Amino acid sequence: MSVKPIFFALDGKHLDNFSRELEILKGNIYGVKVGLEMFTSEGPSSVEKLKKDGWTVFLDLKLHDIPNTVQAAAISAGNIGADYLTIHIASGKEALLAAKESKSENLKLLGVSSALTSKAYSPEISQKVYEEFLLAKESKIDGVICPPSELVKTKELFELIVTPGIRLKNDDSHD
């Protein structure tokens, strides 16, 4: 079986709760996503342990702060071995540039649009997402988190595009 370009979301507080899944998925998927809940519960050791076990790690913290703080966080994420890091595009061009300039060579920055947190999707939201993606492109970050509905336009701007997991119509959201 070839490796699938999929990140498995470790959405929970404790890495140990995912040991069975990680064992099954090892070598079959591209990597794992560590979210804010796990990172604030277990800290950098969660990323360091996953890297030690050979995983590609997507650190989904959605940074949104002043340029100096975003820059320092990007440096820290690279230092603990994260391969991907999310940053809110709404942090602004200065913050995006600061993160890009200071990050480690191996860390890829992924922009997140603040408009994507809305449950109701409309042409106005689509336009807002596109405008934020243009700012991300100007800031030379590596890629974006993109809803499937925006893929066609986004492919004109970025090669590195990550789409969130897609929930089936009848699935419980557990959000």
Language-model regions, residue ranges each:
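Short helix-capping segments at alpha-helix termini
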Residues: 1, 27-28, 52-55, 103-107
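N-terminal glycine-rich anion-binding loop in soluble enzyme alpha/beta folds
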Residues: 1-24
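Conserved anion-binding
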Residues: 2-3, 65-162, 166-173
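Residue-level signature of catalytic and energy-coupling elements of molecular machines
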Residues: 8, 62, 136
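Active-site flanking residues adjacent to catalytic metal/cofactor-binding acidic residues
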Residues: 10, 59-61, 164
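Metabolite-binding pocket within alpha/beta catalytic cores that recognizes anionic/polar moieties
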Residues: 29-84
